[in-house]
């Protein structure tokens, strides 16, 4: 076993040859490299599979022996300063390694078909392999310096992939937004690392924890400074994991290819922040108020992400806000000290969210056969509907991921989310109420996405729904709008422009809607030889990863079922995390009262089903029959209550669709303020500083011309004037000084 750990340092470097060879091939043999470009997908999958097998083997050994291995070698030694590098293999490392490799392999297989016709195919796989290397290096790091180096590399790969289609201004802007937002957190992380080095004199995790605990025990620290350093460290995790208030980059990151959205949201960039807090939890838990701050940020993000997902029309943005909310649950669990629950939810959410994103990619891929290549149209749920008939396999797997995220047993996320919800009651009743209410919102917005996408009829085939004015099909839904105002930062709804859900207006459906052969939309800038009337199921190379992730979603929750009775122990996760849990909670007891568990499970599942029921009631395919509208309208009549209800709905819509006005606030005050300062600085530089410099030159020129005119071109006159000026200056100096 010791020999196996000795070779674990190679884990981050196994996928590295792919980007290096692709780069060398494009420089030395560009034609051959591009011609045989599909072989790089096989090599990427092969190398990452080797890492996966190695990680699984290490994990099995850790489960059986509860061991932790660390190897360190000194790189720089100078008097009292030494910089060490090494690797740490513990349960957290092995869990993250398996997550990165399993999800990464599925995404790579999926991407081979998804990106097959993209000119940046080679560039994409080079970035992806380097992304895997960076993330594996991050999770195996044994000190804060290595963490920071690989932290920045993970960010670099994320920016490259978010802005992969950099010729599109929207993608370029999203890349810049992610970069600038994460700069704030990364700067805080760097300051926090330097602060704790100044306090303890070490970057190594083991030494750092031990020295810091001794200083705390002996009361030799300035707690205000220590708390500030801890907050700065936490700021890095806030930005990376899209926690409030540095969450604004996450929905815009959907401008990248869909496979990278799956990887970022499941096992890499956003998981890095959760990993950092989990790694530093022995440090945070002994600092006053920092754990409470982590839980507060987590619960705010839980609720904010759920409310912002309610009105999204873009399927990927809806899933992005869902990720934000679920990451908030993990951060809340870490803030409460529920280490096991947080990592359990990290595992289950990773597979469920990867399944949902790859499923959305399959949906987008199929919609492009109708609307052409246009992300604004192919990702718009208002143009979808009825896809269950055309993409049945994608529909089944997407439903599995949706039910899992809703917390429906026995799917994966039910077990992990239920633990967090139960622990929240012991920590704070207020936090518990918010967390449980958000569980219902999660079920609502996830089933909203599912119903708008798969149920009803294909909305892209309908052009008019009553009246002379053409309105989008999705405007009939609860969160609909008549259209998008261009060049407007904020969008609002009022009684004149909104189309209410509970109205007596009938919306006739085109009789020939399902027999149309002409596409609903065409793109002038994109050439396509033929466009299909209906979407079709994706190829097997895209369906295979979705199917495998569906199996993970079904069964991965079993590793954390807290069943330990009569000598039968099914709780693999607790055995796996035993060294870390014993470090944090030496006298912890993982036994569970099953009566209490079943009681809480019934409540949480009931809340989830209530959210599903509301979503089904509001978003079921009512357009196939007007009887549903008549049934609803029989309960609601026009009047003051109806007007008030509509205003409330419109207010909720405006809040959600405009991202809680946080982006607008940042744009107006931060971006506008910085631009105003830049313009003022430019004015001072050009008008004042340059004016002074140019003014001296102009005055010198005028004086010179004057002397030239008075002197008449004679050298004797110039000498006389020069001596006169010198005499005047000497006289003034003598009189004054």
Swiss-Prot record:
How the protein sits in the membrane?
A: Multi-pass membrane protein
What binding partners and quaternary form does the record give?
NDH is composed of at least 16 different subunits, 5 of which are encoded in the nucleus.
- Catalysis performed (reactions): a plastoquinone + NADH + (n+1) H(+)(in) = a plastoquinol + NAD(+) + n H(+)(out); a plastoquinone + NADPH + (n+1) H(+)(in) = a plastoquinol + NADP(+) + n H(+)(out)
GO CC annotation: what is one? chloroplast thylakoid membrane
| Keywords of the record | Chloroplast, Membrane, NAD, NADP, Plastid, Plastoquinone, Quinone, Thylakoid, Translocase, Transmembrane, Transmembrane helix, Transport
* Gene Ontology MF terms in the entry: NADH dehydrogenase (ubiquinone) activity; quinone binding
Name of the top EC class for this enzyme: translocase
Q: What is its main location?
A: plastid
- What name has this protein been given in UniProt? NAD(P)H-quinone oxidoreductase subunit 5, chloroplastic
Name the domain of life this protein comes from: Eukaryota
The record's gene field reads: ndhF
Family label: Belongs to the complex I subunit 5 family.
* An individual GO BP term: electron transport coupled proton transport
TM helices/strands, residue ranges = 9-29, 40-60, 89-109, 125-145, 147-167, 185-205, 219-239, 258-278, 286-306, 327-347, 354-374, 396-416, 425-445, 543-563, 602-622, 717-737
């Amino acid at each position: 076993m010791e020999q196996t750990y000795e070779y674990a340092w190679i884990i981050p470097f196994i996928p590295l040859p792919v980007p290096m060879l692709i780069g060398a091939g494009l420089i030395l043999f560009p034609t051959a490299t591009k011609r045989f470009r599909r072989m790089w997908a096989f090599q990427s999958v092969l190398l990452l599979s080797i890492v996966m097998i190695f990680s699984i083997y290490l994990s099995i050994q850790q489960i059986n022996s509860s061991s932790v291995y660390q190897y360190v070698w000194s790189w720089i030694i100078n008097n009292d300063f030494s910089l060490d590098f090494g690797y740490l293999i513990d349960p957290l490392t092995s869990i993250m390694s398996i997550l990165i490799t399993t999800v990464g392999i599925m995404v790579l297989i999926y991407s081979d078909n998804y990106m097959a016709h993209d000119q940046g195919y080679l560039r994409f796989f080079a970035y992806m392999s380097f992304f895997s290397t960076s993330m594996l290096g991050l999770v195996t790091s044994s000190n804060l310096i290595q963490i920071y180096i690989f932290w920045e590399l993970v960010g670099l790969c994320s920016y490259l992939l978010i802005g992969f289609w950099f010729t599109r201004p929207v993608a370029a802007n999203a890349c810049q937004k992610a970069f600038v937002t994460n700069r704030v957190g990364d700067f805080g992380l760097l300051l926090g690392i330097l602060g704790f080095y100044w306090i303890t004199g070490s970057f190594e995790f083991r030494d750092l924890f031990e020295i810091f605990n001794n200083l705390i025990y002996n009361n030799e620290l300035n707690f205000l400074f220590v708390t500030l350093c801890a907050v700065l460290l936490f700021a890095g995790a806030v930005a990376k994991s899209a926690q409030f208030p540095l969450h604004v980059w996450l929905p815009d990151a959907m401008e990248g290819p869909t496979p990278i959205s799956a990887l970022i949201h499941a096992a890499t960039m956003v998981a890095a922040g959760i990993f950092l807090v989990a790694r530093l939890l022995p440090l945070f838990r002994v600092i006053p108020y920092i754990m409470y701050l982590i839980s507060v940020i987590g619960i705010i993000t839980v609720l904010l992400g759920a409310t912002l997902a309610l009105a999204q029309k873009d399927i990927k943005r809806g899933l992005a806000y869902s990720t934000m909310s679920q990451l908030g649950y993990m951060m809340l669990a870490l803030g409460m000290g529920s280490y096991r629950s947080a990592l359990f939810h990290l595992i289950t959410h990773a597979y469920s969210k990867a399944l949902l994103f790859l499923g959305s990619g399959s949906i987008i891929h199929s919609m492009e056969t109708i609307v052409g290549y246009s992300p604004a149209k192919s990702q718009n749920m208002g143009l979808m509907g009825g896809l269950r008939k055309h993409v049945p396999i994608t529909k089944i797997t997407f439903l599995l991921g949706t039910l899992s995220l809703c917390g429906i047993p026995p799917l994966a996320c039910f077990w992990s989310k239920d633990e967090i919800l139960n622990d929240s009651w012991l920590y704070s009743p207020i936090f518990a109420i918010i967390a449980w209410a958000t569980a219902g919102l999660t079920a609502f917005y996830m089933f909203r996405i599912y119903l708008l996408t798969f149920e009803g009829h294909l909305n892209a085939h309908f052009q008019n729904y009553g009246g002379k004015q053409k309105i989008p099909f999705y405007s009939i839904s609860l969160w609909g709008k008549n259209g998008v105002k261009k060049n407007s930062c904020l969008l609002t709804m009022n009684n004149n422009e909104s189309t209410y859900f509970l109205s007596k207006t009938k919306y006739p459906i085109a009789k020939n809607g399902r027999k149309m052969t002409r596409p609903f939309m065409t793109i002038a800038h994109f050439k396509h030889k033929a466009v299909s009337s209906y979407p079709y199921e994706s190829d097997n190379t895209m369906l295979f990863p979705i199917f495998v992730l569906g199996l993970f979603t079904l069964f991965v929750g079993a590793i954390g079922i807290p069943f330990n009775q009569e000598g039968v122990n099914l709780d693999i996760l607790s055995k796996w995390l035993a060294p870390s849990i014993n470090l944090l909670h030496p006298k912890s007891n993982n036994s569970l009262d099953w009566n209490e568990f079943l009681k809480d499970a019934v409540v949480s599942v009931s809340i989830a089903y209530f959210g599903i029921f509301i979503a089904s009631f509001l978003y079921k395919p009512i357009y196939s029959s007007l009887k549903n509208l008549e049934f609803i309208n029989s309960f609601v009549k026009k009047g003051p209550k109806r007007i008030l209800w509509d205003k409330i709905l419109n207010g909720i819509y405006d809040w959600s669709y405009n991202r809680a006005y946080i982006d607008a606030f940042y744009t107006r005050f931060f971006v506008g303020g910085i631009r105003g300062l830049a313009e003022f600085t430019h004015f001072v530089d050009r008008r004042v500083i340059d004016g002074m410099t140019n003014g001296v030159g102009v005055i010198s020129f005028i004086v010179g011309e004057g002397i030239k005119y008075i002197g008449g071109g004679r050298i004797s006159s110039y000498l006389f004037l020069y001596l006169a000026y010198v005499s005047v200056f000497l006289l003034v100096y003598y009189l004054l000084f």
